[in-house]
Curated annotation (Swiss-Prot):
Lineage, broadest ranks: Bacteria, Pseudomonadati, Pseudomonadota, Alphaproteobacteria, Hyphomicrobiales
Principal subcellular localisation of the protein: cytoplasm
PROSITE patterns registered for this protein in UniProt: G_TR_1, G_TR_2
Protein name: Elongation factor G
UniProt keyword list: Cytoplasm, Elongation factor, GTP-binding, Nucleotide-binding, Protein biosynthesis
SUPFAM superfamilies in the record: EF-G C-terminal domain-like, P-loop containing nucleoside triphosphate hydrolases, Ribosomal protein S5 domain 2-like, Translation proteins
GO BP terms: ribosome disassembly
A molecular function (GO) term: guanosine tetraphosphate binding
Positions that bind GTP: 17-24, 81-85, 135-138
SMART domains documented for this protein: EFG_C (SM00838), EFG_IV (SM00889)
Domain of life the protein comes from: Bacteria
Length: 690
């Protein structure tokens, strides 16, 4: 089956927003008007086509980015729905990697909100061309002009209106198109399907002229010929103006701002026109780079005749099809039934079922081309961020970077059956979401879930209970402490048990001292003259190792310690490996006491990004958490604060930071090193655990 749409006619874009700005409703309307969705799904009734997981339908928030294909004016739109909640920013970043452009939805009443700032910064990081849609213009308090000012003040970006609203709040009727200098109004009866051009209302003529002038002046700056003509009094025609707005979007010279009310079905068709007119096709953005087997840089052009290269950006477990891997094809042609290589993992895969997804209905296809976003069923090895490519022309596309999880909880299945289901379920969840990790605590044997935030883990637990029917108890978050000796100690210990028959006898003499940080446990025997026979040395080591997992301060693992066996004694009949194991264990515990063991706590490297107004509060709060500020710098119009903070003082921080900054500050943290805990902290931990 040959290609139906030229790659220049593709628009791979996402819809980004703060939670509740109307992103899912906007997507729903796009699907409705492009003829893909026959009944409009309302989020507040929990029926939106894009929000298809049970948890999303209940909470009214979008969690997974579903990819949907639709058509408008002869162009093929691949829409990637992205989540808008801060705990899911990993999903947003992942979507941004495979998008060519984005529509940023603002709540016309709220303007630029905290999460808008976060997704905007992520858009800057990946250099995603954007247009802005001021939604909810029918809401009480909606103010289009405040939205424009917010973009300048809070995002440090240059907005240019290409539409103005007609009517305010409940009287919102339509918009002024500043490119064509026409009014457009919608008929309420036809669910927004019918709209017509009108002359610009008299009360808006002056304002329309003022904003048209701003638009033209910003646009002509981008082309010397048009600028010269403009200075000679020649206005650019509609086609030229559109070409220049497109250029502005592609180079981020300015951001076109549109308006409407998706819920009231007004302004969606012109938004679709703007997606087609101004957002890039795959050939308008820089070609993707990768590396070959030898680490040399390779560029893959968006062309069907180039070697095949695709990136897996999302993995989902589908109850009917099994594992589905969403991929973006950057170059070449993908054909069902052929073999490819997963170059990230050096494994072969066979392409089985290929699907085009529409929220949660699917269409089987046999071929897909550069620029397509497809869902592949049944891949065995693929994980998020992996590259699949032609085995003869291998390439690894740039890897996605995922932040380390910052919060962990223990989970205990209630029954044996739950235990078995839990293992399978966690493996699937970890494959779907790289920011969610699972590990086993060797000390307690508990299964530990690690994630990006409290909501993130709540939803994982919810999925375990509903989708996989696992019943489990969830523990409170916990910190992993360690112990270490601080000074050299020498011990001489004799284990003697002689009560008729074969007794037990072993004597050991150790020097125990701190090792270099990160060196771990080291054992050396310097015994001479056979004081401890060679066959008993493994018993000595076994005794020492049994103490390492549970120290003398509060029962946490002992790290960075060196033990030297310098002398000992044995008995021809009563000595054994077991006797030396018991003697070594007791001697080591005594040496840990003598060597003044201390408690170590994990110190996290914390980065807070906050608007300047809140810098003082954020620093004060970090200091109160025993944090040490390492430095500050500016990123755009935000302040970046770097600090070292003990992990035990960081629980609940995300909620504190949100309330302290009205939700506008964000933070990341990762483990940096272990440090000695102050006496009061050590005493508190000993009281709890020892």
């Amino acid at each position: 089956m040959p290609r139906v749409h030229a790659i220049e006619d593709y628009r791979n874009f996402g819809i980004m927003a703060h939670i509740d700005a109307g992103k899912t409703t906007t997507t729903e309307r796009i699907l409705y008007y492009t003829g893909k969705s026959h009944k409009i799904g309302e989020v507040h009734e929990g029926a939106a086509t894009m929000d298809w997981m049970e948890q999303e339908q209940e909470r009214g928030i979008t969690i997974t980015s579903a990819a949907t294909t639709a058509f408008w004016n002869g162009k093929r739109l691949n829409i990637i729905d992205t989540p808008g909640h801060v705990d899911f920013t990993i999903e947003v970043e992942r979507s941004l990697r495979v998008l060519d452009g984005a529509v940023v939805v603002l709540d016309g009443n709220q303007g630029v909100e905290p999460q808008t700032e976060t997704v905007w910064r992520q858009g800057d990081k990946y250099r995603v061309p954007r247009i802005v849609f001021a939604n909810k213009m029918d809401k009480t308090g909606a103010d289009f002009y405040k939205c424009l000012q917010d973009i300048i003040d809070r995002l440090g970006a240059k907005p240019i209106a290409i539409q103005l609203p007609i009517g305010e709040e409940s009287n919102f009727k339509g918009l002024v198109d500043l490119v064509r200098m026409k009014g457009v109004i919608w008929e309420d009866e036809a669910l927004g399907a019918n709209f017509k051009d009108i002359d610009i209302p008299a009360d808006l003529v002056e304002k329309a002229k003022e904003y048209r002038e701003k638009l033209v002046e910003a646009a002509v700056e981008l082309d010397d010929e048009v600028l010269t003509a403009f200075l000679d009094g020649v206005e650019p025609d509609e086609a030229t103006l559109k070409r220049l707005i497109r250029k502005a979007v592609l180079t981020s010279a300015f951001y076109p701002v549109l308006c409407g009310s998706a819920f009231k079905n007004k302004g969606v068709q012109p938004l679709l026109d703007a997606v087609v007119d101004y957002l890039p096709s795959p050939v308008d953005v820089p070609a993707i780079k990768g590396v070959d087997d030898d680490g040399n840089e390779i560029i893959r052009l968006p062309n069907d005749s180039e070697p095949l290269a695709l990136l897996a950006f999302k993995i989902m477990d589908d109850p009917f099809v099994g594992t589905i891997t969403f991929c973006r094809i950057y170059s070449g042609t993908l054909i069902s039934g052929t073999g490819v290589v997963n170059s990230t993992r050096d494994r072969k895969e066979r392409i089985g079922r290929m699907l085009l997804m529409h929220a949660n209905n699917r269409e089987d296809i046999k071929e897909a081309y550069a620029g397509d976003i497809v869902a592949l069923a049944g891949l065995k090895e693929a994980r998020t961020g992996d590259t699949l490519c032609d085995a003869n022309k291998p390439v690894i596309l740039e890897k996605m970077e995922f932040p380390e999880p910052v919060i962990e909880i223990a989970i205990e299945p209630k029954t044996k059956a739950d235990q078995e289901k839990l293992g399978v379920a966690l493996a699937k969840l970890a494959a779907e979401d790289p920011s969610f990790r699972v590990s086993t605590d060797l000390e307690s044997g508990q299964t530990i879930l690690k994630g990006m935030g409290e909501l993130h883990l709540d939803i994982k637990v919810d999925i375990l209970r509903r989708t996989y029917k696992v019943d489990a108890n969830i523990g409170a978050p916990q910190v992993a402490f360690r112990e270490r000796v601080t000074k050299k100690a020498e011990v001489d210990y004799t284990h003697k048990k002689q009560t008729g028959g074969t007794g037990q006898f072993a004597r050991v003499k150790f020097i125990v001292e701190p090792n270099e940080p990160g060196k771990g446990f080291e054992f050396e025997s310097k015994v001479v003259g056979g004081a401890v026979p060679k066959e008993y040395i493994p018993g000595v080591e076994k005794g020492l190792n049994s103490v390492l997992s549970s120290g003398v301060v509060a029962g946490f693992p002992v790290v960075d310690v060196k033990v030297t066996l310098i002398d000992g004694a044995y008995h021809d009949v009563d000595s054994s490996a077991l006797a030396f194991e018991i003697a070594s264990r007791a001697a080591f515990r005594e040496a840990l006491q003598k060597g003044k063991s201390v408690l170590l706590e994990p110190i996290m490297k914390v980065e807070c990004v906050t608007p300047e107004d809140y810098t003082g509060s954020v620093i004060g709060d970090l200091n109160s958490r025993r944090g040490q500020i390492q430095g500050q710098d500016m990123r755009g119009n935000a302040n970046v604060i770097n600090a070292m903070v003990p992990l035990m003082n960081m629980f609940g921080y995300v909620n504190n930071l949100r309330s302290m900054s009205q939700g506008r500050a964000t933070f990341t943290m990762q483990f940096d090193h272990y440090a000695e805990a102050p006496a009061n902290v050590s005493a508190e931990v000993q009281k709890k655990f020892a």
